[in-house]
């Protein structure tokens, strides 16, 4: 049978995208009691969900929202039977070795253009980079090009530059907003990691908003080799590294990827990509990296972590209930009882 591994499931929720909260709802369906520690940046989505679940009949002993600081958050993880935590490399290093914690770390999603017609797929690259505000782990942060990598970088930068800066409350806002200090810190961090990479986008990424805060304009950088360390940099705004790639580079630069969009006619390469353990999802053809749908696992099914197979062996016939005095077993019941006890 399919059995739970525990009773209480703790979630240290992220604040990058509302859709991440769809995952822990599955734990409720499996019979877990769920405790959610929301992100301080975006506590609204889990609050709405928990409120709706309360109205639907779930009790406070079944699902609870626990806003806490980071110190108490770790206590929550330790007290639960199982936990799911989101974060960057530091979180992955802290919890990654524990079997009772599911770490949702950096996605480092990628696009491979290797069909000889890279110019036809610019829209797919732009969607993969900028879709959902580029805040999701399934947004592409690196593009590998078998061909004209500089040309692809320029076209992607041109298309992304057409995104209009809007305050976050606007209906047509696309770019994520930050405190001005945070936006400038992200820009400075990016500049400090360029090394030999060429910044294709404009030099000033920070766009301060009249009402306060700022958004970061998209950043496109061109690298000179597929194994450059910058391809692993993932930032919470449209930021993508474009690198040359050839069949001689193989699968190695494409590893450690949540979602890889692979546009190539090479079936042998596709087979190797699908079989590569460090690549969680492979989209073949013009399908953006953030493409998801009902029944399609994002990073495996949550049930694979929360549940396990359990063997239960029992007699084919249960022990019968006591009968009123004088009432006799039917012939069939008598035969089955004899069979169970080895008398038939």
Question: Would you name each region that the model predicts?
Answer:
Residues 44, 92-93, 151-152, 267-272, ...:
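Short, charged/polar "capping" segments at the starts of alpha-helices
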Residues 48-52, 152-159:
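Alpha-helical scaffold elements adjacent to nucleotide-binding pockets in ATP/GTP-utilizing enzyme cores
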Residues 63, 239-240:
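Short, conserved active-site loop motifs that form the nucleotide-linked donor/cofactor pocket
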Residues 40-42, 148-149, 288-290:
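Short beta-alpha junction loops
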Residues 108, 115-141, 158-225, 246, ...:
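C-terminal segments
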Residues 92, 118-121, 149-153, 226-230:
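Short helix-loop capping/hinge motifs at secondary-structure junctions, enriched
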Residues 1-127, 144, 299, 303:
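Rossmann-like NAD(P) dinucleotide-binding subdomain of oxidoreductase/dehydrogenase enzymes
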């Amino acid at each position: 049978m399919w059995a739970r591994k525990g009773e209480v499931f703790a979630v240290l929720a992220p604040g990058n995208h509302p859709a991440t909260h769809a995952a822990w709802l599955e734990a409720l369906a499996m019979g877990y009691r769920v405790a959610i520690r929301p992100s301080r940046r975006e506590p609204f989505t889990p609050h709405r969900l928990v409120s709706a679940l309360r109205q639907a009949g779930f009790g406070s002993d079944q699902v609870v929202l626990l806003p806490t600081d980071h110190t108490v958050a770790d206590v929550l993880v330790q007290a639960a039977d199982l936990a799911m935590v989101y974060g960057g490399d530091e979180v992955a290093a802290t919890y990654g070795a524990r079997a009772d914690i599911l770490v949702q770390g950096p996605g480092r999603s990628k696009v491979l253009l290797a069909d000889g017609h890279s110019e036809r797929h610019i829209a797919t690259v732009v969607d993969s980079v900028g879709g959902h505000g580029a805040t999701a782990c399934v947004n592409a942060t690196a593009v590998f090009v078998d061909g004209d990598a500089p040309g692809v970088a320029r076209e992607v930068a041109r298309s992304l530059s057409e995104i209009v800066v809007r305050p976050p409350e606007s209906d047509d806002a696309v770019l994520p907003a930050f405190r001005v200090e945070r936006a400038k810190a992200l820009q400075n961090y990016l500049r400090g990691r360029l090394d030999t990479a060429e910044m294709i986008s404009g030099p000033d990424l920070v766009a301060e908003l009249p009402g306060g805060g700022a958004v970061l304009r998209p950043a496109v950088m061109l690298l000179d080799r597929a194994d450059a360390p910058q391809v692993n940099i993932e930032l919470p705004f449209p930021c993508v590294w474009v690198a040359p790639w050839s069949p001689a580079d193989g699968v190695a630069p494409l590893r450690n990827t949540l979602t890889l969009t692979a546009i190539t006619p090479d079936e042998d390469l596709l087979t190797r990509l699908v079989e590569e353990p460090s690549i969680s999802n492979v989209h073949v053809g013009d399908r953006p990296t953030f493409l998801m749908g009902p029944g399609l696992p994002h990073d495996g099914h949550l049930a694979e972590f929360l549940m396990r197979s359990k063997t239960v062996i029992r007699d084919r016939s249960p022990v019968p209930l006591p009968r009123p005095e004088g009432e006799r077993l039917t012939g069939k019941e008598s035969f089955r009882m004899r069979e169970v006890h080895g008398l038939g």
